Amino acid sequence: MEEFKRNLELDRSQQHDFIYPLIFQEYIYALAHDRGLNRSIFLENTGYDNKSSLLIVKRLITHLITQMYQQNRFLFSGNDSNQKKFFGDNTNLYSQMIFEGFAVVVEIPFYLRLLSFLEGKERVKSHNLRSIHSIFPFLEDKFSHLVYVLDILISHPIHLEIVVQTLRYWVKDASSLHLLRFFLHEYPIWNSLITPKKSSFSFSIRNQRFFLFLYNFHVCEYESIFVFLRNQSSHLRSISSETFLERISFYRKIELEVFAKDFKAILWVFKEPFLHYVRYRGKAILASKGTSLLMNKWKYYLVNFWQCYFYMWSQPRRIHINQLSNHSLDFLGYLSTVRLKPLMVRSQMIENSFLIENASKKFDTLMPITPMIGSLSKAKFCNVLGHPMSKPVWAALSDSDIIERFGRIYRNLSHYYSGSLKKMSLYRIKYILRLSCARTLARKHKSTVRAFLKRLGVGLLEEFFTEEEQVFYLTFAKASSNSGELYRRRVWYLDIICINDLANYE
Protein backbone atom coordinates (compact mmCIF):
# COMPACT_ATOMS: atom_id res chain seq x y z
CA MET A 1 0.00 0.00 0.00
CA GLU A 2 2.84 2.39 0.75
CA GLU A 3 4.29 1.74 -2.70
CA PHE A 4 0.96 2.60 -4.26
CA LYS A 5 0.76 5.85 -2.34
CA ARG A 6 4.14 6.87 -3.67
CA ASN A 7 3.05 6.14 -7.23
CA LEU A 8 -0.21 8.00 -6.85
CA GLU A 9 1.50 11.15 -5.66
CA LEU A 10 3.00 11.65 -9.16
CA ASP A 11 6.14 13.26 -7.76
CA ARG A 12 4.22 16.06 -6.08
CA SER A 13 6.00 15.52 -2.79
CA GLN A 14 9.17 16.86 -4.42
CA GLN A 15 7.61 20.24 -5.05
CA HIS A 16 8.74 22.67 -2.32
CA ASP A 17 8.96 25.82 -4.40
CA PHE A 18 8.51 28.97 -2.35
CA ILE A 19 7.62 31.53 -4.96
CA TYR A 20 6.12 34.25 -2.75
CA PRO A 21 9.36 36.32 -2.60
CA LEU A 22 9.32 36.55 -6.40
CA ILE A 23 6.09 38.55 -6.20
CA PHE A 24 8.20 41.45 -4.90
CA GLN A 25 10.66 41.34 -7.80
CA GLU A 26 10.35 44.56 -9.76
CA TYR A 27 11.51 43.10 -13.08
CA ILE A 28 8.72 40.50 -13.00
CA TYR A 29 6.07 43.19 -13.42
CA ALA A 30 8.07 45.17 -15.94
CA LEU A 31 8.70 42.04 -18.00
CA ALA A 32 5.09 40.89 -17.83
CA HIS A 33 3.69 44.33 -18.65
CA ASP A 34 6.11 45.24 -21.46
CA ARG A 35 6.16 41.93 -23.31
CA GLY A 36 2.38 41.53 -23.27
CA LEU A 37 0.19 38.51 -22.74
CA ASN A 38 0.92 36.64 -25.95
CA ARG A 39 4.70 36.32 -25.75
CA SER A 40 6.98 34.04 -23.80
CA ILE A 41 8.32 35.55 -20.60
CA PHE A 42 10.90 32.90 -19.84
CA LEU A 43 13.83 34.76 -21.39
CA GLU A 44 17.07 36.07 -20.01
CA ASN A 45 16.60 39.20 -17.95
CA THR A 46 18.44 42.12 -19.53
CA GLY A 47 18.18 45.58 -18.09
CA TYR A 48 16.17 44.87 -14.94
CA ASP A 49 17.34 44.77 -11.37
CA ASN A 50 17.23 41.31 -9.82
CA LYS A 51 17.08 42.56 -6.25
CA SER A 52 13.87 42.19 -4.29
CA SER A 53 11.89 45.40 -4.12
CA LEU A 54 8.65 46.12 -2.30
CA LEU A 55 8.40 49.54 -3.90
CA ILE A 56 6.84 48.60 -7.23
CA VAL A 57 4.28 46.26 -5.67
CA LYS A 58 3.47 48.76 -2.94
CA ARG A 59 2.86 51.46 -5.54
CA LEU A 60 0.63 49.23 -7.62
CA ILE A 61 -1.46 48.08 -4.67
CA THR A 62 -1.68 51.63 -3.27
CA HIS A 63 -2.85 53.01 -6.61
CA LEU A 64 -5.31 50.15 -6.99
CA ILE A 65 -6.88 50.68 -3.56
CA THR A 66 -6.97 54.47 -4.01
CA GLN A 67 -8.61 54.30 -7.41
CA MET A 68 -11.12 51.68 -6.24
CA TYR A 69 -12.07 53.93 -3.31
CA GLN A 70 -12.44 56.97 -5.56
CA GLN A 71 -14.38 54.97 -8.10
CA ASN A 72 -16.88 53.84 -5.45
CA ARG A 73 -17.17 57.41 -4.11
CA PHE A 74 -17.97 58.80 -7.54
CA LEU A 75 -20.30 55.92 -8.18
CA PHE A 76 -22.51 56.81 -5.23
CA SER A 77 -22.17 60.59 -5.56
CA GLY A 78 -23.53 60.58 -9.10
CA ASN A 79 -20.86 62.87 -10.56
CA ASP A 80 -19.67 63.01 -14.15
CA SER A 81 -19.58 59.62 -15.88
CA ASN A 82 -16.33 60.54 -17.63
CA GLN A 83 -14.59 60.73 -14.26
CA LYS A 84 -15.92 57.31 -13.32
CA LYS A 85 -14.74 55.92 -16.61
CA PHE A 86 -11.31 57.45 -16.12
CA PHE A 87 -10.86 55.92 -12.69
CA GLY A 88 -12.31 52.63 -13.83
CA ASP A 89 -9.76 52.39 -16.63
CA ASN A 90 -6.91 53.12 -14.21
CA THR A 91 -8.19 50.44 -11.85
CA ASN A 92 -8.17 47.90 -14.64
CA LEU A 93 -4.65 48.99 -15.62
CA TYR A 94 -3.23 48.52 -12.11
CA SER A 95 -5.09 45.26 -11.53
CA GLN A 96 -3.90 43.98 -14.90
CA MET A 97 -0.26 44.64 -13.98
CA ILE A 98 -0.63 42.85 -10.65
CA PHE A 99 -2.43 39.87 -12.18
CA GLU A 100 0.05 39.55 -15.03
CA GLY A 101 2.96 39.61 -12.61
CA PHE A 102 1.34 37.06 -10.35
CA ALA A 103 0.60 34.76 -13.30
CA VAL A 104 4.25 34.96 -14.37
CA VAL A 105 5.42 34.03 -10.88
CA VAL A 106 3.03 31.10 -10.45
CA GLU A 107 4.03 29.67 -13.84
CA ILE A 108 7.69 29.41 -12.81
CA PRO A 109 7.48 26.04 -10.95
CA PHE A 110 5.67 24.46 -13.89
CA TYR A 111 8.18 25.85 -16.35
CA LEU A 112 11.08 24.46 -14.29
CA ARG A 113 9.44 21.03 -14.41
CA LEU A 114 9.16 21.36 -18.19
CA LEU A 115 12.85 22.21 -18.50
CA SER A 116 13.84 19.21 -16.39
CA PHE A 117 11.63 17.01 -18.56
CA LEU A 118 13.23 18.26 -21.78
CA GLU A 119 16.79 17.74 -20.54
CA GLY A 120 18.49 15.09 -22.61
CA LYS A 121 15.74 15.10 -25.27
CA GLU A 122 16.05 16.31 -28.83
CA ARG A 123 14.91 19.90 -29.07
CA VAL A 124 13.61 19.47 -32.60
CA LYS A 125 11.45 16.54 -31.60
CA SER A 126 9.91 18.42 -28.68
CA HIS A 127 9.04 21.35 -30.95
CA ASN A 128 7.49 19.03 -33.52
CA LEU A 129 5.23 17.51 -30.90
CA ARG A 130 3.86 20.97 -30.12
CA SER A 131 2.30 21.19 -33.56
CA ILE A 132 -1.44 20.67 -33.83
CA HIS A 133 -0.89 18.59 -36.97
CA SER A 134 1.19 16.09 -34.98
CA ILE A 135 -2.09 14.77 -33.55
CA PHE A 136 -3.46 13.59 -36.89
CA PRO A 137 -0.70 11.08 -37.79
CA PHE A 138 -1.31 9.60 -34.34
CA LEU A 139 -5.05 9.37 -35.02
CA GLU A 140 -4.41 7.88 -38.44
CA ASP A 141 -2.14 5.22 -36.96
CA LYS A 142 -4.27 4.29 -33.94
CA PHE A 143 -7.93 5.08 -34.57
CA SER A 144 -8.33 2.87 -37.63
CA HIS A 145 -8.04 -0.17 -35.32
CA LEU A 146 -10.52 1.10 -32.70
CA VAL A 147 -14.29 0.77 -32.50
CA TYR A 148 -15.87 3.28 -30.11
CA VAL A 149 -15.04 6.82 -29.12
CA LEU A 150 -16.11 9.06 -26.23
CA ASP A 151 -16.63 12.63 -27.42
CA ILE A 152 -16.05 14.73 -24.28
CA LEU A 153 -16.53 18.41 -23.48
CA ILE A 154 -14.48 19.17 -20.37
CA SER A 155 -16.57 20.85 -17.69
CA HIS A 156 -15.62 23.95 -15.75
CA PRO A 157 -15.33 23.79 -11.94
CA ILE A 158 -18.34 25.00 -9.97
CA HIS A 159 -16.18 27.53 -8.11
CA LEU A 160 -12.60 28.69 -8.67
CA GLU A 161 -11.82 27.97 -5.01
CA ILE A 162 -11.68 24.32 -6.05
CA VAL A 163 -8.82 25.18 -8.40
CA VAL A 164 -6.96 26.78 -5.48
CA GLN A 165 -7.45 23.65 -3.38
CA THR A 166 -5.96 21.43 -6.08
CA LEU A 167 -3.20 23.93 -6.87
CA ARG A 168 -1.80 23.57 -3.34
CA TYR A 169 -0.55 20.07 -4.16
CA TRP A 170 1.75 21.51 -6.81
CA VAL A 171 2.76 24.84 -5.27
CA LYS A 172 3.94 24.36 -1.69
CA ASP A 173 3.64 28.03 -0.84
CA ALA A 174 0.74 29.06 1.37
CA SER A 175 1.39 32.79 0.97
CA SER A 176 1.05 32.68 -2.80
CA LEU A 177 -2.12 30.65 -2.55
CA HIS A 178 -3.59 33.11 -0.05
CA LEU A 179 -2.88 35.93 -2.49
CA LEU A 180 -4.52 33.94 -5.28
CA ARG A 181 -7.54 33.32 -3.06
CA PHE A 182 -7.69 37.05 -2.32
CA PHE A 183 -7.84 37.82 -6.04
CA LEU A 184 -10.66 35.37 -6.61
CA HIS A 185 -12.75 36.55 -3.65
CA GLU A 186 -12.19 40.29 -4.05
CA TYR A 187 -13.00 40.27 -7.76
CA PRO A 188 -16.24 38.33 -8.32
CA ILE A 189 -15.95 39.01 -12.04
CA TRP A 190 -13.38 36.21 -12.16
CA ASN A 191 -16.27 33.80 -11.95
CA SER A 192 -17.00 34.72 -15.56
CA LEU A 193 -14.52 31.95 -16.40
CA ILE A 194 -17.34 29.56 -15.55
CA THR A 195 -20.25 31.41 -17.15
CA PRO A 196 -18.78 33.92 -19.64
CA LYS A 197 -20.87 36.99 -20.34
CA LYS A 198 -20.48 39.76 -22.86
CA SER A 199 -20.11 42.35 -20.09
CA SER A 200 -17.04 40.64 -18.66
CA PHE A 201 -15.42 39.51 -21.91
CA SER A 202 -13.14 42.54 -22.20
CA PHE A 203 -11.91 42.05 -18.66
CA SER A 204 -11.16 38.40 -19.38
CA ILE A 205 -9.10 39.33 -22.44
CA ARG A 206 -7.04 41.87 -20.49
CA ASN A 207 -6.15 39.22 -17.93
CA GLN A 208 -6.00 36.35 -20.37
CA ARG A 209 -2.72 34.93 -19.06
CA PHE A 210 -4.16 34.38 -15.59
CA PHE A 211 -7.35 32.83 -16.98
CA LEU A 212 -5.34 30.47 -19.17
CA PHE A 213 -3.12 29.44 -16.29
CA LEU A 214 -6.07 28.52 -14.06
CA TYR A 215 -7.90 26.69 -16.82
CA ASN A 216 -4.83 24.80 -18.04
CA PHE A 217 -4.06 23.72 -14.50
CA HIS A 218 -7.63 22.52 -14.07
CA VAL A 219 -7.33 20.45 -17.26
CA CYS A 220 -3.93 19.13 -16.16
CA GLU A 221 -5.50 17.83 -12.94
CA TYR A 222 -8.33 16.29 -14.91
CA GLU A 223 -5.86 14.47 -17.18
CA SER A 224 -3.74 13.13 -14.31
CA ILE A 225 -6.19 10.25 -13.95
CA PHE A 226 -5.18 8.92 -17.38
CA VAL A 227 -1.46 9.08 -16.52
CA PHE A 228 -2.13 7.08 -13.38
CA LEU A 229 -4.24 4.46 -15.15
CA ARG A 230 -1.66 4.13 -17.91
CA ASN A 231 1.12 3.39 -15.43
CA GLN A 232 -0.86 1.05 -13.20
CA SER A 233 -3.21 -0.77 -15.59
CA SER A 234 -1.30 -4.06 -15.38
CA HIS A 235 -1.42 -4.17 -11.58
CA LEU A 236 -5.02 -3.29 -10.83
CA ARG A 237 -6.29 -6.85 -10.59
CA SER A 238 -4.59 -7.53 -7.23
CA ILE A 239 -5.15 -4.09 -5.68
CA SER A 240 -7.91 -3.33 -3.21
CA SER A 241 -10.19 -0.38 -3.89
CA GLU A 242 -9.64 1.05 -0.40
CA THR A 243 -6.21 2.25 -1.53
CA PHE A 244 -7.75 4.65 -4.01
CA LEU A 245 -10.01 6.26 -1.44
CA GLU A 246 -7.08 7.11 0.85
CA ARG A 247 -5.34 9.42 -1.60
CA ILE A 248 -6.08 13.03 -0.69
CA SER A 249 -4.91 14.57 -3.95
CA PHE A 250 -6.56 11.93 -6.12
CA TYR A 251 -9.96 11.51 -4.56
CA ARG A 252 -11.24 13.60 -1.73
CA LYS A 253 -11.75 11.62 1.48
CA ILE A 254 -15.43 10.94 1.03
CA GLU A 255 -17.88 8.88 2.99
CA LEU A 256 -20.39 8.27 0.22
CA GLU A 257 -21.43 4.68 0.71
CA VAL A 258 -22.89 4.33 -2.76
CA PHE A 259 -19.65 5.40 -4.39
CA ALA A 260 -17.62 3.05 -2.19
CA LYS A 261 -19.81 0.10 -3.13
CA ASP A 262 -19.82 0.80 -6.84
CA PHE A 263 -16.10 1.43 -7.14
CA LYS A 264 -15.07 -2.24 -7.19
CA ALA A 265 -17.60 -2.94 -9.90
CA ILE A 266 -16.06 -0.44 -12.30
CA LEU A 267 -12.43 -1.18 -11.44
CA TRP A 268 -12.09 -3.71 -14.24
CA VAL A 269 -12.64 -0.96 -16.80
CA PHE A 270 -9.03 0.12 -16.38
CA LYS A 271 -7.65 -3.16 -17.71
CA GLU A 272 -8.40 -2.13 -21.30
CA PRO A 273 -5.00 -1.95 -23.08
CA PHE A 274 -6.28 -0.40 -26.33
CA LEU A 275 -7.24 2.99 -24.95
CA HIS A 276 -6.15 6.29 -26.50
CA TYR A 277 -6.77 9.82 -25.28
CA VAL A 278 -6.43 13.07 -27.24
CA ARG A 279 -7.34 16.61 -26.15
CA TYR A 280 -7.22 20.10 -27.58
CA ARG A 281 -8.50 23.01 -25.48
CA GLY A 282 -11.84 22.06 -23.93
CA LYS A 283 -12.60 19.05 -26.10
CA ALA A 284 -11.24 15.54 -25.53
CA ILE A 285 -11.52 12.17 -27.26
CA LEU A 286 -11.27 8.80 -25.57
CA ALA A 287 -11.20 5.89 -28.04
CA SER A 288 -11.19 2.18 -27.28
CA LYS A 289 -11.29 -1.19 -28.99
CA GLY A 290 -13.81 -2.46 -26.46
CA THR A 291 -17.57 -2.81 -26.55
CA SER A 292 -20.36 -0.32 -26.02
CA LEU A 293 -20.75 -1.60 -22.46
CA LEU A 294 -17.11 -0.80 -21.76
CA MET A 295 -17.51 2.77 -23.01
CA ASN A 296 -20.59 3.23 -20.83
CA LYS A 297 -18.51 2.11 -17.87
CA TRP A 298 -15.90 4.73 -18.75
CA LYS A 299 -18.59 7.39 -19.04
CA TYR A 300 -19.98 6.40 -15.64
CA TYR A 301 -16.54 6.57 -14.06
CA LEU A 302 -15.65 9.99 -15.50
CA VAL A 303 -18.94 11.50 -14.33
CA ASN A 304 -18.33 10.23 -10.79
CA PHE A 305 -14.73 11.42 -10.87
CA TRP A 306 -15.71 14.95 -11.88
CA GLN A 307 -18.54 15.18 -9.36
CA CYS A 308 -16.67 13.78 -6.36
CA TYR A 309 -13.26 15.34 -6.95
CA PHE A 310 -13.95 18.60 -8.78
CA TYR A 311 -17.46 19.18 -7.35
CA MET A 312 -18.85 19.72 -10.82
CA TRP A 313 -22.14 18.56 -12.23
CA SER A 314 -21.32 16.77 -15.46
CA GLN A 315 -24.30 16.83 -17.75
CA PRO A 316 -24.88 13.69 -19.84
CA ARG A 317 -24.90 15.73 -23.05
CA ARG A 318 -21.22 16.61 -22.49
CA ILE A 319 -20.15 12.99 -23.11
CA HIS A 320 -21.28 11.17 -26.25
CA ILE A 321 -20.56 7.54 -27.16
CA ASN A 322 -20.15 7.07 -30.91
CA GLN A 323 -19.09 4.24 -33.18
CA LEU A 324 -16.21 5.20 -35.44
CA SER A 325 -17.52 3.28 -38.43
CA ASN A 326 -20.69 5.40 -38.77
CA HIS A 327 -19.79 8.65 -37.03
CA SER A 328 -17.75 11.63 -38.20
CA LEU A 329 -15.44 13.01 -35.54
CA ASP A 330 -15.39 16.81 -35.38
CA PHE A 331 -11.98 17.67 -33.95
CA LEU A 332 -9.54 20.53 -34.56
CA GLY A 333 -11.51 21.85 -37.51
CA TYR A 334 -11.42 18.53 -39.40
CA LEU A 335 -14.14 15.94 -39.95
CA SER A 336 -12.45 12.60 -39.32
CA THR A 337 -13.99 9.28 -40.28
CA VAL A 338 -12.98 5.62 -40.32
CA ARG A 339 -14.31 4.01 -43.50
CA LEU A 340 -14.03 0.52 -44.94
CA LYS A 341 -11.90 0.35 -48.07
CA PRO A 342 -12.56 -2.76 -50.24
CA LEU A 343 -9.50 -4.59 -51.48
CA MET A 344 -9.39 -7.43 -54.02
CA VAL A 345 -6.56 -9.95 -53.59
CA ARG A 346 -5.78 -12.64 -56.21
CA SER A 347 -4.49 -15.92 -54.81
CA GLN A 348 -2.85 -18.52 -57.10
CA MET A 349 -2.77 -22.19 -56.08
CA ILE A 350 -1.14 -24.42 -58.73
CA GLU A 351 -3.78 -24.47 -61.49
CA ASN A 352 -6.55 -22.58 -59.72
CA SER A 353 -6.76 -18.91 -58.85
CA PHE A 354 -9.04 -17.23 -56.34
CA LEU A 355 -10.24 -13.69 -55.84
CA ILE A 356 -10.48 -12.76 -52.17
CA GLU A 357 -12.29 -9.58 -51.19
CA ASN A 358 -10.97 -7.94 -48.05
CA ALA A 359 -12.03 -4.74 -46.38
CA SER A 360 -9.46 -2.59 -44.61
CA LYS A 361 -10.15 0.40 -42.40
CA LYS A 362 -8.83 3.79 -43.44
CA PHE A 363 -8.74 7.01 -41.44
CA ASP A 364 -9.85 10.00 -43.53
CA THR A 365 -9.76 13.71 -42.72
CA LEU A 366 -11.96 16.22 -44.52
CA MET A 367 -12.37 19.97 -44.36
CA PRO A 368 -15.96 20.81 -43.29
CA ILE A 369 -17.22 23.45 -45.71
CA THR A 370 -20.36 24.50 -43.80
CA PRO A 371 -18.63 25.60 -40.56
CA MET A 372 -15.90 27.29 -42.60
CA ILE A 373 -18.45 29.32 -44.57
CA GLY A 374 -20.06 30.20 -41.25
CA SER A 375 -16.71 31.53 -40.00
CA LEU A 376 -16.19 33.54 -43.18
CA SER A 377 -19.72 34.90 -42.86
CA LYS A 378 -19.09 35.93 -39.26
CA ALA A 379 -15.94 37.76 -40.39
CA LYS A 380 -17.97 39.51 -43.15
CA PHE A 381 -16.18 37.90 -46.12
CA CYS A 382 -19.41 36.36 -47.44
CA ASN A 383 -23.05 35.86 -46.50
CA VAL A 384 -24.49 32.77 -44.84
CA LEU A 385 -24.98 31.13 -48.25
CA GLY A 386 -21.32 31.56 -49.20
CA HIS A 387 -21.74 34.43 -51.66
CA PRO A 388 -18.66 36.70 -51.49
CA MET A 389 -19.03 40.21 -50.05
CA SER A 390 -16.80 43.26 -49.91
CA LYS A 391 -14.91 44.15 -46.75
CA PRO A 392 -15.77 47.85 -46.13
CA VAL A 393 -13.54 48.22 -43.05
CA TRP A 394 -10.47 47.47 -45.20
CA ALA A 395 -11.38 49.93 -47.97
CA ALA A 396 -9.18 52.63 -46.40
CA LEU A 397 -6.04 50.49 -46.82
CA SER A 398 -3.76 50.54 -49.83
CA ASP A 399 -4.39 48.10 -52.68
CA SER A 400 -1.29 46.07 -51.87
CA ASP A 401 -2.29 45.79 -48.20
CA ILE A 402 -5.79 44.63 -49.09
CA ILE A 403 -4.50 41.97 -51.48
CA GLU A 404 -1.84 40.88 -48.99
CA ARG A 405 -4.38 40.48 -46.18
CA PHE A 406 -6.75 38.36 -48.23
CA GLY A 407 -3.85 36.32 -49.58
CA ARG A 408 -2.42 35.75 -46.11
CA ILE A 409 -5.76 34.48 -44.81
CA TYR A 410 -6.01 31.97 -47.63
CA ARG A 411 -2.40 30.87 -47.27
CA ASN A 412 -2.97 30.21 -43.57
CA LEU A 413 -6.14 28.23 -44.28
CA SER A 414 -4.45 26.29 -47.06
CA HIS A 415 -1.50 25.57 -44.78
CA TYR A 416 -3.74 24.25 -42.02
CA TYR A 417 -6.11 22.21 -44.22
CA SER A 418 -3.36 20.63 -46.30
CA GLY A 419 -4.25 17.34 -44.60
CA SER A 420 -7.74 17.26 -46.10
CA LEU A 421 -8.34 14.25 -48.32
CA LYS A 422 -10.33 16.27 -50.85
CA LYS A 423 -9.34 19.79 -51.82
CA MET A 424 -12.63 20.92 -53.42
CA SER A 425 -13.75 22.69 -50.22
CA LEU A 426 -10.44 24.54 -50.09
CA TYR A 427 -10.85 25.66 -53.70
CA ARG A 428 -14.26 27.07 -52.83
CA ILE A 429 -12.73 29.06 -49.96
CA LYS A 430 -10.14 30.43 -52.40
CA TYR A 431 -12.94 31.51 -54.74
CA ILE A 432 -14.79 33.31 -51.90
CA LEU A 433 -11.70 35.16 -50.70
CA ARG A 434 -10.53 36.13 -54.20
CA LEU A 435 -13.92 37.54 -55.17
CA SER A 436 -14.29 39.26 -51.79
CA CYS A 437 -10.89 40.85 -52.34
CA ALA A 438 -11.90 42.03 -55.83
CA ARG A 439 -15.17 43.48 -54.53
CA THR A 440 -13.35 45.31 -51.74
CA LEU A 441 -10.97 46.90 -54.25
CA ALA A 442 -13.84 47.77 -56.57
CA ARG A 443 -15.72 49.36 -53.67
CA LYS A 444 -12.66 51.41 -52.75
CA HIS A 445 -12.15 52.77 -56.28
CA LYS A 446 -15.88 52.98 -57.05
CA SER A 447 -15.55 50.66 -59.99
CA THR A 448 -16.84 47.26 -61.08
CA VAL A 449 -15.49 43.85 -60.13
CA ARG A 450 -15.01 42.91 -63.78
CA ALA A 451 -12.73 45.91 -64.35
CA PHE A 452 -10.51 45.07 -61.42
CA LEU A 453 -10.27 41.39 -62.27
CA LYS A 454 -9.25 42.39 -65.79
CA ARG A 455 -6.74 44.90 -64.45
CA LEU A 456 -5.08 42.68 -61.84
CA GLY A 457 -5.56 39.29 -63.48
CA VAL A 458 -2.49 37.13 -62.89
CA GLY A 459 -1.25 39.36 -60.07
CA LEU A 460 -4.28 38.62 -57.93
CA LEU A 461 -4.01 34.92 -58.77
CA GLU A 462 -0.35 34.73 -57.72
CA GLU A 463 -1.15 36.25 -54.35
CA PHE A 464 -3.57 33.37 -53.69
CA PHE A 465 -1.25 30.62 -54.92
CA THR A 466 0.58 29.41 -51.85
CA GLU A 467 4.17 28.33 -51.55
CA GLU A 468 2.95 25.04 -50.05
CA GLU A 469 0.95 24.29 -53.21
CA GLN A 470 4.01 24.88 -55.39
CA VAL A 471 6.18 22.58 -53.27
CA PHE A 472 3.33 20.07 -53.14
CA TYR A 473 3.04 19.76 -56.91
CA LEU A 474 6.80 19.74 -57.49
CA THR A 475 7.22 16.97 -54.91
CA PHE A 476 4.41 14.62 -55.91
CA ALA A 477 3.86 15.35 -59.59
CA LYS A 478 6.63 13.02 -60.76
CA ALA A 479 5.62 10.23 -58.39
CA SER A 480 1.92 10.41 -59.32
CA SER A 481 0.95 10.10 -62.96
CA ASN A 482 -2.75 10.11 -62.08
CA SER A 483 -4.13 13.58 -61.35
CA GLY A 484 -6.84 12.09 -59.12
CA GLU A 485 -4.22 10.48 -56.90
CA LEU A 486 -2.36 13.78 -56.68
CA TYR A 487 -5.62 15.50 -55.74
CA ARG A 488 -6.02 13.21 -52.70
CA ARG A 489 -2.53 13.69 -51.27
CA ARG A 490 -2.33 14.80 -47.64
CA VAL A 491 0.46 16.78 -46.00
CA TRP A 492 0.85 17.44 -42.26
CA TYR A 493 2.99 20.34 -41.07
CA LEU A 494 4.85 20.47 -37.76
CA ASP A 495 4.96 24.25 -37.34
CA ILE A 496 1.30 24.97 -36.48
CA ILE A 497 0.91 25.68 -32.77
CA CYS A 498 -2.36 27.66 -32.63
CA ILE A 499 -5.62 28.35 -34.45
CA ASN A 500 -6.62 31.99 -34.89
CA ASP A 501 -10.15 33.26 -35.30
CA LEU A 502 -10.91 34.89 -38.65
CA ALA A 503 -12.54 37.74 -36.74
CA ASN A 504 -9.09 38.76 -35.48
CA TYR A 505 -8.31 40.10 -38.94
CA GLU A 506 -10.58 43.08 -38.36
UniProtKB/Swiss-Prot annotation:
Gene source species: Rhododendron tomentosum (Marsh Labrador tea)
Question: GO cellular component terms?
Answer: chloroplast
Q: What InterPro entries does the annotation carry?
A: Domain_X, Maturase_MatK, Maturase_MatK_N
MF term (GO), any = RNA binding
Write out the entry's keywords from A to Z.
Answer: Chloroplast, mRNA processing, Plastid, RNA-binding, tRNA processing
Location in or out of the cell: Plastid, Chloroplast
List where this protein forms a coiled coil: none
One Pfam family, short name: Intron_maturas2
| Principal location listed in the UniProt entry | plastid
Kindly list the biological process annotations in GO that this record carries. mRNA processing; RNA splicing; tRNA processing
Protein known as: Maturase K
Which protein family is it in?
A: Belongs to the intron maturase 2 family. MatK subfamily.
What does the protein in this record do? Usually encoded in the trnK tRNA gene intron. Probably assists in splicing its own and other chloroplast group II introns.
